[in-house]
Amino acid sequence: MGTHASPNVLLVVLDSVRAANCSLYDAARETTPYLSRLADESTVYTQARAPSNWSLPSHVSLFTGLDAHVHQVTVHDRLRAGHTVFEALAADGYATGLFSENGFLTGRDAGLADPFETVVGVPDDYDDRYDTTVLDPGPDGFYYADRVLAWSAEVDGPWAACLNLMDAHRPFEPREAYDRWGDDRARTIQADLPIRWEWAFYGGDRPYWQLGALESLYDGGIRQADAVLEHVLESLRSRGALDETLVVVCGDHGDGFGEPGRVPGEPPAVSHILPMHEELLHVPLVVRPPGGATGERVDELAALTRFPAVARAHARGDPPSRGFTVDRALALKQPVTADLRERFERRCDPVEPYLEPSRAVYENAPDTSGAVRKHSYWGDTGVTTLVHAPGVVEHREPIEPETVDRAFRDGNDRDGGDDRDPVREPLAGRQPDADVEAQLAALGYY
């Protein structure tokens, strides 16, 4: 199994989905029944880590295989051509497609859409059956699922696609069939909040307990994303294409609902972009190779940055023995700059705890079965923790931030250092499209 030459490649990104809230990883709510069934014919990674705590840097890392501190792409930059796995696959004869509501992928001039021949973002008009939200002006994930299915059915030859599903991204508006844990109070709390709600909590306007109500809606969003995934994969199965496809399902980052910091001075986790908690970095990762697998669960450390190497190896018909496992994984929080920094300065007093730099290094813990070590810092304070499972974290000992920074320097040198071809280029004053910015604002990015 898994040795087909030139299989299709399907990367399904469950945007904002954290491992701790997936029933696949023993979450109390049955949020991922299909993913749990898919696990029986796949490889499940129990200790997978995202390279950053929000979509833009994580997707650049997913597409290029470069850690976030290496590519350094922020909202002020764009990814230069020639660095992604999808361009490499296109050169090998693959048709390529990108399907997502996330404007950082399909709308904004970030360079992430450029590698793809077909790009489907938020449409001007769409069928009412996809119009299931009030706060979010775009269609739900079933729209993008149907677009990737229609596109792949017309491709003559191998194809490679990224389907990014935003059903579990704020605002949380799952269809009634999947909204199993939310209630009127939760929906009212969300409706009364600004869509970018970090400052309502960090600034003291709202109590942190209200985030628990939002989490009940978030879990419904995960359940809906799971149903969209089922629709896509079972449709491929019914047409005989699933066994000809490498399927990689992952979260690009998680989300925060008031979890306390584990480093002294670290604020509670609220949403994403700022927090570096495990709830933001520990993500689901399920890989179904062509022909299926045997339901193996891998407890070693795994990194999303392995996707390009894994995809290219499968395309050659030579799957890598290590899969997504790594000896070390790196994750970072990008600097809080420009408008985002100004908003924190206006709403938070003191503001300094929210602006601190943060990095994390993960390593396997061979002396503790199934666990990984996390060395991280927030500002000038660092700690080592032992992560046994999603949401199960044991504090170990304080460390110096330099211990973490040294690992990042080693990683940069390993990836070519200053001699490496530039991956990014500045936007240099180019103004974003107003419609794209409005759509991103509706998703809580501004």
Where do the protein language model's features map onto the residues?
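Catalytic domains that recognize anionic headgroups
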Residues: 1-446
